[in-house]
Amino acid sequence: MDRFPADFADFLSPAGRRVLDGKLTLRAEPFLARPDLIAPAKAKAAFALLERVLGPVVKPLDRAIPPESILNQTRNYQERLPKTVRVRTADLDASRGKARDAARATGLETMLLSPSFRDFATALAGRKLTRGFGRQALRYGPGDYSGPHTDHHPEDPAAKDGYFDLHLSFVGGGATRQLLVYAKDGHLSETVDVAVPGLVSAYRLPFWHYTTPLEGKASAARWLILGTFYFA
């Protein structure tokens, strides 16, 4: 595959197309993950295309645990952990740059802007979404992770009461496992393996969650294409 399909609907499996018909939604749950909504052959081809074209232009994002989180602690059980992360990323909304050029060259931008992509997100969210949305690409390599965080943005008027994320996951054969751990009933007790080719994940944010280090061979990689939508 040299290009993503122009219409996101053409990227979907029969089960994925049923989402467009309103057959699947988050309802009351904050999180949903399904491995059967993208056609398997297209998911495999998408990984190879992203590695070849977008792989050389993603940039490292590295936020380690600050030493002050221990050195400045003066009381027992006073731990405070800011969001930590190690991944490679590209802002697909940037007005210019190599990542935006790659997204255009591969047809990824056209597919994400197709009406069926937004319709798919709206169907999963189970409520109306604003027309505009954010787009981002992440590439996890061996040991890359995202630490505990909520994705709560109380200073953003459009997001302070919650918003919706749609994630498309494309995984190479060298990856064996990466868990998403998320909170239920006040505890980080729920897990799902997200190192699954073609996995579609839907998030009604904010809630506590984190992603464990990607496991596998030295060649392991997992791509994540994100769409971030505000509720209308």
Q: What is each model feature region?
A:
Residues D2-F11, R17-D119:
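Non-heme Fe(II)/2-oxoglutarate
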Residues A45, P213-L214:
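Short conserved micro-motifs at the rims of enzyme active sites and ligand-binding pockets
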Residues R100-Y210, K217-A232:
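Catalytic core of non-heme Fe(II) oxygenases with the double-stranded beta-helix
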